[in-house]
């Protein structure tokens, strides 16, 4: 597995280990903070990077299945070059190494950001393919182009499935990735936008990936999304679970332009990813719904975790970790 130290990778490793599977995971510098010592010891760790094609090839010796979860998630325009290099070139390296090493199947973690936006006021599904639009983020473009590398691999004989999760809720380092949403709720970030989108529990993403890997399914991509919710509702529930004040100041499009600039300056001073960028300020003003019927059709017994339960579970785990350390 690549990306074993990230949000999806950590929970995927936990599921694979709990099922008694033999797992080899790539890591760059540190083991996942949210895995137990016992879980870490059950995994064969290989130090490496998806940008090191030579090391990737050797790490796949004897491997039959590959989960590719390594990616950079950033909406900071100043990281575009880094974003494209890791997400596109990294995926190409994983696909090439898999083919050369005789890997039988790959499950690739993409994103709903890589889906098209052609039909107005219609839930997005897997038939809507990418078109160049100003509303597309650099991150979404990088994930779309990384998908093309996986499709190329499938065309060259590699079995593969692509999963496109919506906004993932899970316990992880809340200074990075989508877990920053929980940190902002804990810190009583006062602003909210009128928009919304799809949400899914990270445990469901992991469960779907393992199920697709084991199933006789290839050459397909699937939206993995439990519910469509407004951002204000989700942030309010997070704040309530933390015992904090929920967001109370509505961000108009004009005000969003001011807020993202303030957040940008704060991020420079703190040397951290900004909570709000020009891209996220723009997309946060609209409700984008996602259709999850294809996954249900291929996996009739698959059950999603209700988002309210996901929020409750994640807040509980984060409080346990950060308020006791």
For the regions a language model picked out, list residue spans one by one.
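N-terminal Rossmann NAD(P)H-binding glycine-rich loop of SDR-like oxidoreductase domains
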Residues: 1-19
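NAD(P)H-binding glycine-rich loop region in Rossmannoid oxidoreductase-like domains
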Residues: 32, 43-89, 97
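Conserved catalytic-site region of short-chain dehydrogenase/reductase
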Residues: 75, 112-122, 168-174
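Conserved Rossmann-fold NAD(P)-dependent oxidoreductase catalytic core, especially the SDR/UDP-sugar
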Residues: 81, 86-138
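Substrate-positioning beta->alpha
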Residues: 93, 145, 176-177, 193-214, ...
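NAD(P)-dependent short-chain dehydrogenase/reductase
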Residues: 157-199
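Mid/C-terminal beta-alpha module of Rossmann-like enzyme folds, strongest
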Residues: 208-275, 292, 297, 306-307, ...
